[in-house]
């Protein structure tokens, strides 16, 4: 059944039109996203861009307002976190201080029912294989053994197949109902937000009117004028307050009407659902799944008893090779405790923490605590590993070492990983794919080099790279780029005449050479020594530019600096949309 599930989709995770609306703000705005299997994908962006909310939607900690979350092609939008087969690592490792490292690692296994079921399934298969070897040695035909295998496979796979069917039907049958229910829950928050916005706007109007009246009173030259101003102020305040109450009543009426409409639509939808064939099929499957596993188990046991009575399970006819096979199979049959201990030790070896299993979290370093948190997350062998800024609590040197280790560990285990960070250096060094986000929207998806070399818009261009990309307003005349009416570079480009935004990174700004390139001058307003070179900020033509300065020269704030810009490193953006414009040299 795992094979069937894996074949259903080549994607480990899919977002389909995901929206998370908190009422007063939209945290995720209609995101579509695909994470391939065995890939490390980083959600990158500034604080408040929606990356942690996106991770929480994947984890099942936040329910989307609309849209679908798919794991391996199956809809898990309504599934709780414990049913999603994933591991979580947060910025704060949340290790239990009163438990040893070993106890922290194994704790999730004792509380996971699906883990127990997996152990039972493995033990059952091992015992089945042993029985088949003995029955074959005692004369059972290949047809009889094939039938026994079929019944065993059916016993294991059929309940899973039914569960997947139920999941798919739940999605298709209740999709519209779920969206209506989500909108219904949002109405009180949206109504409250509208009233708060109205109150803020009204208070602002009152302040403006009072400020103007106060200024007028200060210049009033008679008691009569003062009285007129006060009278007008009183009237205006009365009008503003009356308007506030009217608008507030309108807001309440509007949202009450919306509430009533959605309730009516929801009632109609629920009635319509019950008339569909899919709903009838779903009811039948839900009833059947309670009894079918027991029936399949009985069928298997009944046939096995027939073969056992016919051929017996005595091992006298077994060859040395068959006895050896049975011995190996018996090793697979283990108790829950033994299996958990074995699994935890295997994970500890992979993460190189076997020597600290007996220690408490308080007695190990931050890097070791982070590895313990990862061990606890992967000990259940999740399909997906989610990491929310796991390196933020580490110092700079340990952060670099740990991110290198995480990358190697992820590649060795081939586990699909979603990594959240605001640190572009982390994202560039660790990722197969980067999802750059801003204001709840995906700005660009691609490899680290794609985002750096071909940013989709100005946000991506300035967010990736340190220091950030320089972007200036330029104009195009007959293919020539002009900055403040002067040529920016000597190269011409295939661009229509008009305004254009031009970007270039700090290392594309160099000292002048005798090659005919336009030379610009500016004033150095800051210098930062990075060891291998310096980064300066130069003010030129009213714009501050990041430039690279070589250590071979002495620079001080206030120095006049001359520079040229390399034409091959230019990026072009539309002034209206800020989107990238692909341009060729003439």
From Swiss-Prot:
One of its GO terms (cellular component) is ATP-binding cassette (ABC) transporter complex, substrate-binding subunit-containing. InterPro entries: AAA+_ATPase, ABC_transporter-like_ATP-bd, ABC_transporter-like_CS, ABC_transpr_MalK/UgpC-like, Mo/tungstate-bd_C_term_dom, NA-bd_OB-fold, P-loop_NTPase. Pfam families: ABC_tran. Residues 13-464 form the ABC transporter domain. Keywords: ATP-binding, Nucleotide-binding, Transport. PROSITE patterns: ABC_TRANSPORTER_1, ABC_TRANSPORTER_2. GO terms for molecular function: ATP binding; ATP hydrolysis activity. The keyword ATP-binding applies. ATP binds at residues 45-52. The keyword Cytoplasm does not apply. Belongs to the ABC transporter superfamily. This is Putative ABC transporter ATP-binding protein MG187 homolog. It comes from Mycoplasma pneumoniae (strain ATCC 29342 / M129 / Subtype 1) (Mycoplasmoides pneumoniae). The lineage of its organism: Bacteria, Bacillati, Mycoplasmatota, Mycoplasmoidales, Mycoplasmoidaceae.
């Amino acid at each position: 059944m795992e094979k069937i599930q894996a074949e259903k989709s080549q994607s480990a995770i899919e977002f389909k039109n995901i929206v998370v609306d908190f009422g007063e703000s939209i945290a995720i705005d209609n995101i579509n996203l695909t994470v391939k299997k065995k890939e490390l994908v980083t959600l990158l962006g500034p604080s408040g861009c929606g990356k942690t909310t996106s991770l929480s939607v994947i984890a099942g900690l936040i329910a989307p307002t609309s849209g679908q979350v798919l794991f391996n092609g199956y809809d898990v939008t309504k599934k709780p976190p414990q049913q999603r087969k994933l591991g979580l690592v947060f910025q704060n490792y949340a290790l239990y201080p009163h438990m040893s490292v070993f106890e922290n690692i194994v704790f999730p296994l004792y509380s996971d029912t699906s883990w127990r079921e997996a152990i039972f399934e493995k033990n059952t298969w091992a015992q089945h294989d042993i029985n088949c070897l003995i029955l074959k040695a005692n004369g059972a035909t290949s047809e009889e053994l094939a039938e026994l295998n079929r019944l065993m496979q059916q016993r294991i796979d059929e309940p899973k197949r039914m569960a997947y069917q139920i999941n798919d039907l739940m999605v298709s049958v209740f999709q519209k109902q779920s969206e209506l229910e989500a909108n219904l829950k949002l109405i009180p928050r949206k109504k409250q937000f509208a009233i708060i916005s109205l109150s803020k706007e009204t208070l602002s109007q009152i302040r403006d009117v009072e400020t103007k009246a106060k200024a007028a009173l200060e210049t009033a030259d008679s008691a009569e004028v003062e009285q007129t101003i006060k009278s007008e102020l009183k009237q205006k305040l009365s009008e503003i307050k009356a308007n506030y109450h009217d608008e507030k009543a309108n807001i309440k009426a509007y949202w009450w009407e919306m509430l009533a409409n959605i309730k009516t639509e929801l009632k109609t939808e629920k009635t319509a659902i019950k008339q569909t064939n899919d709903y009838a099929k779903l009811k039948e499957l839900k009833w059947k799944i309670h009894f079918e596993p027991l029936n399949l188990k009985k069928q298997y046991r009944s046939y096995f008893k027939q073969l056992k009575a016919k051929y017996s399970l005595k091992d006298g006819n077994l060859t040395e090779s068959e006895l050896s096979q049975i011995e190996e199979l018996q090793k697979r049959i283990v108790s829950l405790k033994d299996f958990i201990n074995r699994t935890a030790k295997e994970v500890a070896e992979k993460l190189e923490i076997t020597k600290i299993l007996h220690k408490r979290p308080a007695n190990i370093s931050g890097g070791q605590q982070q590895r313990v948190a990862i061990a606890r997350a992967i000990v259940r062998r999740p399909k997906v590993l989610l990491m929310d800024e796991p390196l933020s609590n580490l110092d700079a040197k340990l952060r670099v070492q740990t991110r290198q280790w995480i990358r190697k560990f992820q590649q060795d285990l081939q586990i699909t990983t979603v990594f959240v960070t605001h640190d572009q250096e982390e994202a560039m060094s660790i990722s197969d794919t980067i999802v750059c986000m801003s204001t709840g929207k995906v700005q660009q998806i691609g490899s680290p080099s794609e985002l750096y070399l071909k940013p989709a818009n100005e946000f991506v261009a300035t967010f990736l790279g340190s220091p950030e990309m320089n972007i200036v307003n330029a104009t195009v005349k007959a293919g020539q780029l002009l900055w403040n009416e002067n040529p920016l570079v000597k190269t011409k480009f295939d661009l229509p005449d008009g305004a254009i935004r031009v970007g270039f990174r700090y290392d594309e700004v160099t000292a002048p050479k005798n090659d005919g390139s336009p030379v610009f001058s500016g004033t150095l307003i800051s210098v930062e020594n990075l060891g291998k070179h310096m980064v300066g900020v130069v003010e030129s033509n009213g714009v501050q530019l990041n430039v690279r300065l070589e250590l071979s020269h002495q620079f001080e704030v206030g120095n006049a600096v001359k520079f040229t810009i390399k034409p091959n490193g230019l990026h072009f953006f539309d002034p209206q949309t800020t989107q990238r414009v692909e341009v060729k040299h003439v």
